[in-house]
Amino acid sequence: FDGCSGLKQVIFPNTLKEIGDYAFRSCPELITAVLPQGVEQLGKYAFAGSGLKTILIPHSVYWIGEGAYADCKRLNHVTVPDNIVSIPDRMFSGCDSLSEIKLPETADRIGSGVFENCSSLQSIVIPESVRSIGENAFGETHPKFTLLCHRLSEAERYARNHNITFQIIY
């Protein structure tokens, strides 16, 4: 369905286990794609450039490919389930309407460019479990952007090294 400009909705069977690489990339009218419990993998750029506004990734997903939701211009709310430990490179890059995201408390890695060009994102809580943050993970941050992080965490170190405004949380 890559590049299917008229696709508006997808209903997946409950038996679906994997969404392939580029499966729904560049489907700008796709605003509804409810992933069933049982889906385990989301391929690279699977929904990149789609019209999705909100995503809820099922707890059954254990692997997400690079850029899975990149350039989703309407996307504004995301919840990533606790079983995802690595937020892949460029997962949400270019999602300029993204204003709210909940990262799992179990995340240990935030990839490169994950939140690059997410101009509506004003703050993000970085779990204490994060041990690695990739280059340009937050791109060019705007003046009101704040990383909410734990004292002496990797996120605090990253914020200091990249001149990103941060606030210590407990």
Task: Tell me what each language-model feature is.
Residues 2, 20-25, 43-46, 65-68, ...:
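Consensus positions within tandem repeat domains that build extended binding/scaffold surfaces
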Residues 4-18, 28-41, 50-63, 73-86, ...:
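Structural signature of tandem-repeat unit edges
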Residues 161-163:
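Short, structured coil segments at secondary-structure junctions
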